[in-house]
């Protein structure tokens, strides 16, 4: 933990596993249920600790931040601001995108409430950490998100789903079918195991990339093919502030105005955005609206020209 996170051992690490209940006095009969993000109508950690196993700071036995999260999800009493304060949207969506793409059915974001770690750095936000991903690349028709309690409640919110779509699109366009980077990696792996009796089944993965592509595009849906477009008309105005509306495809992480760092972008759906607080000077304004990726690199740009007229005299 300390290798990957600053003071990582001071955070809360939970291992996700089945909950088991013994149903007979002799211990021979038992029942299990998947771990999930359900709230059990109790803030008592005993209700959660058998499927969310404490693996750091065990002596503290502090489940308060975890229970705060599942209570918000389970009661559906959260909005974008409050849930993003508790949960690391990007880390959760990256994990779900990868495990969904490779059809890792044996984990919590798909069909089994286990085989992952849930981690919260001290003073930070909850994230899923990959673990035990050996049931992969099998069923190209597998779902990308499962139906365990709380999973869809979180990931189907448009302000979360947009980021899941984005990271899945990153996989599709950069790291899977026809990816030079992945082809180079597979070649190096082939050379590394030569003569060992181990074979690198590159053809299996190439076939997977081809067969999984359409399913991934269908899961993303219309955002995969939405145009990058400004919908606001450029009629002359006397206002000093401007708001623009538009749409973007799933290749775009955020929207900005070149040179205007105070402008704020708000997403109203998985594709529609509103950019407010744009400052206008008197005369013609040549604005550049930029769609950027998670690294701030420009993916799309479109010019928007608008004239600000002089204010009318009182």
Model-predicted regions and their roles:
Residues 5-10, 117, 143-146:
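Short secondary-structure boundary/capping segments
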Residues 103, 109, 119-224:
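C-terminal catalytic region of ATP-dependent kinase domains
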Residues 115, 127, 288:
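Conserved beta-strand and immediately adjacent loop positions that scaffold enzyme active sites
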Residues 153-154, 234-247:
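Extracellular/luminal Pro/Thr/Ser-rich low-complexity repeat and linker "mucin-like" segments
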Residues 241, 245-312:
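Long, low-complexity serine/threonine/glycine- and acidic-rich segments characteristic of extracellular
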